[in-house]
């Protein structure tokens, strides 16, 4: 997929993997790059605009935990301005198993609600043109880090949700794939809490093993976007990009 002149919405684009992915995206000569984030980062926005002044970059304050109706209001404003949006990237996430409800609200429920909201504008059953969704998940969605079971479960939920979105594409016209980074050196993983403090050194232990940089992850993220494979489960680990096969152990037959 050629990203030239595409309109992209990126939720949580200004930190860690999100920011390095944004740096790569603006190099692809997007037409409009719409950033939705809870906190504005003027320095990061200025940097992105400097990388490629031809890309129209806009920022909207957005908290993924708001009700679906609020998400629809913001998206309507964006669609009214741009007329079309090609890609939605859902990237909001936290890693803190002390905050159980907030972890689920941001990592899973917020992503589902944002996706539900944009279907109002994309769903071909409503006359929409369809669209593409890239959901940032995690390799912990395949195999949990058992010391952070809440985070891992939230990411497994997103992998499952994304797989279902992809299978619904013939009905909705909206395709989807998941982006699953391995352990990446970002502020998110430098300090975080295990569930019930079962392993106080969990962050230290993880970072003692081979990792990847957020720059490597961002580069491979954009390669996955350009590959544009509906239903793909992308693993971005140790600087590599690989589409993995999901093992089926049961089928609903519907």
Swiss-Prot record:
Q: Does the keyword Nucleus apply?
A: no
- What positions are modified (N-acetylmethionine)? 1
What EC number(s) does its UniProt record assign?
Answer: 1.1.1.1
Q: Where is the active site?
A: 151 (proton acceptor)
Catalyzes what? Answer: a primary alcohol + NAD(+) = an aldehyde + NADH + H(+); a secondary alcohol + NAD(+) = a ketone + NADH + H(+)
Record-annotated residues binding substrate? 138
Q: Name one GO molecular function term.
A: identical protein binding
Amino-acid positions noted as binding NAD(+) in the UniProt annotation, renumbered to this chain: 10-33
The record's listing under InterPro entries reads:
ADH_Drosophila-type (IPR002425), NAD(P)-bd_dom_sf (IPR036291), Sc_DH/Rdtase_CS (IPR020904), SDR_fam (IPR002347)
Keyword terms, alphabetized:
Acetylation, NAD, Oxidoreductase
Which residues, by range, are in coiled-coil regions? none
What is its EC class? oxidoreductase
- What are the annotated GO cellular component locations? cytoplasm
What does the sequence similarity comment in the record state about its family? Answer: Belongs to the short-chain dehydrogenases/reductases (SDR) family.
Q: What protein am I looking at?
A: Alcohol dehydrogenase
Organism of origin: Drosophila lebanonensis
Lineage, uppermost ranks: Eukaryota, Metazoa, Ecdysozoa, Arthropoda, Hexapoda
């Amino acid at each position: 997929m050629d990203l030239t002149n595409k309109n992209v919405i990126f939720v949580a684009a200004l930190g860690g993997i999100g920011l390095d992915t944004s740096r790569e995206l603006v190099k692809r000569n997007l037409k409009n790059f719409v950033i939705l984030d809870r906190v504005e980062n003027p320095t990061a926005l200025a940097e992105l605009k400097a990388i490629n002044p031809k890309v129209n970059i806009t920022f909207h304050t957005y908290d993924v935990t708001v009700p679906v109706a609020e998400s629809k209001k913001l998206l309507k404003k964006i669609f009214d301005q741009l007329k079309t949006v090609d890609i939605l990237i859902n990237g909001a996430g936290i890693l803190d198993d002390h905050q159980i409800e907030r972890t689920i609200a941001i990592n899973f429920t917020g992503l589902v609600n944002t996706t539900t909201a944009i279907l109002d504008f994309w769903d071909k059953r409503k006359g929409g043109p369809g669209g593409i969704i890239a959901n940032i998940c995690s390799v912990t969605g395949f195999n949990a880090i058992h010391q952070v079971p809440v985070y891992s479960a939230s990411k497994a939920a997103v992998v499952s949700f994304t797989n279902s979105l992809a299978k619904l594409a013939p009905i909705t016209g909206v395709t989807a794939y998941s982006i699953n980074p391995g352990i990446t050196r970002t502020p998110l993983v430098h300090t975080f809490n295990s569930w019930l403090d079962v392993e106080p050194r969990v962050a230290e232990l993880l970072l003692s093993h081979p990792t990847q940089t957020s720059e490597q992850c961002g580069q491979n993220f954009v390669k996955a976007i350009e590959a544009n494979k509906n239903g793909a489960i992308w693993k971005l680990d140790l600087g590599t990009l690989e589409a993995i096969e999901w093992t089926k152990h049961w089928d609903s037959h519907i």
